[in-house]
């Protein structure tokens, strides 16, 4: 048999009981969820900025980073809603490399899933408590959702997961904003089919139960660029891409058509400084076209305390150990610029 069963994992209920979210923070999350929902549904003209490290590898530096966003959020509260990006699960192109704190709480030690699930939950609770901001994470493993479902205000489904039926069906049971990235091929129809699937009711098996879901009307798309059959990166954040997406949305039987633009990954060719220019181009195009303005509800930006990236083991505080990120000063200025352009 090719599986070796190492540990029986605690259930989500057991982890939640050991590390509960306080009543005060539960109420804060409900308020934040409602604000974000209003943006996705077109009831609130504020703009979403989903910003943070490529991977949330270290609790202290991640929570330090998230807490720095608090003052900026207060300054831009009339124009922007900041959603810290705290990604505890990382997809890997080849399956090798650091897979996130949920799998490997210490990047320099062996994987430990039990400690990883605890570390994931503790980090999210601490980030909310210290910053007053509820966060975004990627749902890489649908069965892990239960460990953080009471903590997250935004969930992303990655380019490699968006075609998977279990991801689509699981999102249909969420009650928070959920972004479906375009697949690495760049196919808009695949992405929109995922939105359609997640917005509708389903009957399936989840964590050992037969379940029914009601559909998630807050499911939308995330444009992250693509990779051609020749291995070249292609972008999909330009004016003509957004107009095409708007036209395709019009033909779909979905509600709340919305898009978030991922400024990194294939849109930047992983040239992290390009995120600044890309963000401003998207904001400019929103000013040029009412259709684009109504469609594009936010940006996704990879940012940390120190710019660039490092190898595991170099121990530079607040510097990414996965994809390179914008540094703090550039990030801070960019958020203020985005707020100014959302007029």
Predicted regions and their residues:
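N- or domain-start disorder-to-order transition segments that initiate the globular core
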Residues: 1-41
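N-terminal beta-rich core of secreted/periplasmic extracellular enzymes
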Residues: 25-38, 42, 72-83, 89, ...
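Acidic (Asp/Glu)-rich catalytic clusters
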Residues: 40-43, 70-77, 125-130, 213, ...
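Conserved phosphate/anionic-ligand binding catalytic regions in large, soluble enzymes, centered on
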Residues: 48-61, 323
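Conserved, mostly hydrophobic/aromatic
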Residues: 52, 261, 327
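Short acidic, Gly/Ser-rich segments with clustered Asp/Glu that frequently serve as metal-coordination loops
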Residues: 54-57, 256, 264-270
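Active-site-facing alpha/beta catalytic cores
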Residues: 66, 79-244, 265-266, 270, ...
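Internal helix-turn-beta structural module
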Residues: 304-342
């Amino acid at each position: 048999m090719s599986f070796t069963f190492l540990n029986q994992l605690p259930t989500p209920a057991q982890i939640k009981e050991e590390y509960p979210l306080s009543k005060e923070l539960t109420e804060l999350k409900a308020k934040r969820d409602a604000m974000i929902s209003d943006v996705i549904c077109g009831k609130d003209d504020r703009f979403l900025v989903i910003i943070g490290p490529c991977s949330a590898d270290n609790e202290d530096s991640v929570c330090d980073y998230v807490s720095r966003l608090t003052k900026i959020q207060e300054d831009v509260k009339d124009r922007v809603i900041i959603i810290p990006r705290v990604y505890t699960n990382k997809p890997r192109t080849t399956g090798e490399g650091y897979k996130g704190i949920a799998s490997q709480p210490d990047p320099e030690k062996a994987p430990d899933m039990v400690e990883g699930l605890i570390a994931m939950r503790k980090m999210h609770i601490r980030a909310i408590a210290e910053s007053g901001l509820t966060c975004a994470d990627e749902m890489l493993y649908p069965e892990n959702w239960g460990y953080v479902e009471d903590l997250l205000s935004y969930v992303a489904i990655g380019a490699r997961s968006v075609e998977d039926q279990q991801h689509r069906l699981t999102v249909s049971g969420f009650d928070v904003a959920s972004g479906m990235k375009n697949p690495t091929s760049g196919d808009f129809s695949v992405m929109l089919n995922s939105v359609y699937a997640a917005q509708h009711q389903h009957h399936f098996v989840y964590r050992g139960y037969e379940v029914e879901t009601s559909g998630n009307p807050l499911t939308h798309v995330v444009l992250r660029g693509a990779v051609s059959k020749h291995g070249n990166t292609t972008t999909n954040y330009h004016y003509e891409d957004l107009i095409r997406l708007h036209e395709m949305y019009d033909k779909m039987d979905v509600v709340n058509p919305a898009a978030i633009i991922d400024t990194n990954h294939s849109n930047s060719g992983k040239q992290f400084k390009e995120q600044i220019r890309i963000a401003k181009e998207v904001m400019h195009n929103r000013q040029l076209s009412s259709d684009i303005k109504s469609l594009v509800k936010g940006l996704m930006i990879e940012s940390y305390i120190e710019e660039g990236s490092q190898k595991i083991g170099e121990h530079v505080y607040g510097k990414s150990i996965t994809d390179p990120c914008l540094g703090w000063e550039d990030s801070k200025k960019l958020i203020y610029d985005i707020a100014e352009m959302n007029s």
